[in-house]
């Protein structure tokens, strides 16, 4: 199997057929809904909160609310449904989550999307939860993860998952690869390609995205949707603490399995970093969309489908050659 990551690959351009990149359509469909871009901010505590979720939904973007404030989930679903907005939440696999799903079914609170979100998703615990969700909330689109192998994708799809989330530990604040020796860190793009070949349903690429070009590369290698943490962290609206050092403003960003999220030092597979303040989230979303429109124009098409068909090369030394924006 060819092993490579985002920075080892360059996509090869095709003849451009549009007069302006603004003609290129970045929309994507996942389940019963279409969204402005194939991008979703990570369901992490320093990336998304209820206010950001609402803003994203109002503006046609996909979102997944994190699962770290369990009590807030029912009121959140009610509020979003009252506003006529898409509801998309996360669940874990512990005992209490089964009762939570039953409560939703009993109260007629049917979310549009539920993401089963654990670090090692190729497990009986996840398979059991998929089956429980499908039985209790048959109308809900179920995303399950995280996984890193074709076997895992097939097994979760067969259990009833409507989409699988691929990526074990490639994220910027994830240290699974260091703490355990396992994961897709350093070969996330190849893992995505490997999994996508086996998938019959959509795949969400999760982790390792460091540039906007990586979104196009993810689409090329089989992703329907791309989950992004660090590029969405550090904005004005981002949850989390702010600090000022030597006149520079920083915001915190920590992993979902870090001691900062858990509140204890137990099975820690995440860390905390401070990122330079990036301004408004809306500006980043606009820039991301414009860059993706440019990617489509380089691919020689008018929509995301064009990117899926382009040729690519694997470059021996990193394409960035030390360059940063």
UniProtKB/Swiss-Prot annotation:
GO CC, one annotated term: cytosol
InterPro entries xref list: Aldolase_TIM, GMP_reductase, GuaC_type_2, IMP_DH/GMP_Rdtase_CS, IMP_DH_GMPRt
CDD domains assigned to the protein according to its UniProt record, in alphabetical order: IMPDH
An MF annotation (GO) of this entry: GMP reductase activity
Entry annotation: catalytic residues: 174
Binding residues annotated for NADP(+), in chain numbering: 203-226
Enzyme Commission number(s) from the entry: 1.7.1.7
Gene Ontology biological process terms, A to Z: purine nucleotide metabolic process
Reaction it catalyzes: IMP + NH4(+) + NADP(+) = GMP + NADPH + 2 H(+)
Keyword terms of this UniProt record: NADP, Oxidoreductase
Pfam families in alphabetical order: IMPDH
Family designation: Belongs to the IMPDH/GMPR family. GuaC type 2 subfamily.
NCBIfam families listed in its UniProt record: GMP_reduct_2, PRK05458.1
Function: Catalyzes the irreversible NADPH-dependent deamination of GMP to IMP. It functions in the conversion of nucleobase, nucleoside and nucleotide derivatives of G to A nucleotides, and in maintaining the intracellular balance of A and G nucleotides.
Protein name: GMP reductase
Species annotation: Enterococcus faecalis (strain ATCC 700802 / V583)
């Amino acid at each position: 199997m060819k092993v490579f990551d985002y920075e080892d690959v360059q996509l090869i351009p095709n003849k451009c057929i549009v007069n302006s990149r603004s003609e290129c359509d970045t929309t994507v469909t996942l389940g019963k809904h279409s969204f402005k871009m194939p991008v979703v901010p990570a369901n992490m505590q320093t990336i998304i909160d209820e206010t950001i979720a609402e803003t994203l939904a109002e503006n046609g973007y996909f979102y997944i609310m994190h699962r770290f404030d369990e009590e807030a989930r029912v009121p959140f679903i009610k509020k979003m449904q009252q506003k006529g907005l898409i509801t998309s939440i996360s669940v874990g696999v512990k005992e209490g989550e089964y009762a939570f799903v039953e409560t939703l079914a009993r109260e007629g609170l049917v979310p549009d999307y539920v993401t089963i979100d654990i670090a090692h998703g190729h497990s009986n615990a996840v398979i059991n939860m998929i089956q429980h969700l499908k039985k209790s909330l048959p109308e809900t689109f179920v995303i399950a993860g995280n996984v890193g192998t074709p076997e895992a994708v097939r097994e979760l799809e067969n259990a009833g998952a409507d989409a699988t989330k691929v990526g074990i530990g490639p994220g910027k604040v994830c240290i699974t690869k260091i703490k355990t020796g396992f994961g897709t860190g350093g070969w996330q793009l190849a893992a995505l390609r490997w999994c996508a070949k086996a998938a019959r349903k959509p795949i969400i690429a999760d982790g390792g995205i460091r540039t906007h070009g990586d979104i196009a590369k993810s689409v090329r290698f089989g992703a329907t949707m791309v989950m992004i943490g660090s590029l969405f962290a550090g904005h004005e609206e981002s949850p989390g603490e702010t600090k000022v050092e030597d006149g520079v403003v920083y915001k915190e960003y920590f992993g979902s399995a870090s001691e900062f999220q858990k509140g204890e030092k137990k099975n820690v597979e995440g860390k905390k970093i401070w990122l330079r303040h990036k301004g408004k989230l809306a500006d980043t979303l606009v820039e991301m969309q414009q860059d993706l429109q440019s990617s489509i124009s380089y691919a020689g098409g008018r929509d995301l489908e064009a990117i899926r068909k382009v040729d690519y090369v694997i470059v021996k030394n990193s394409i960035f050659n030390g360059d940063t924006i």
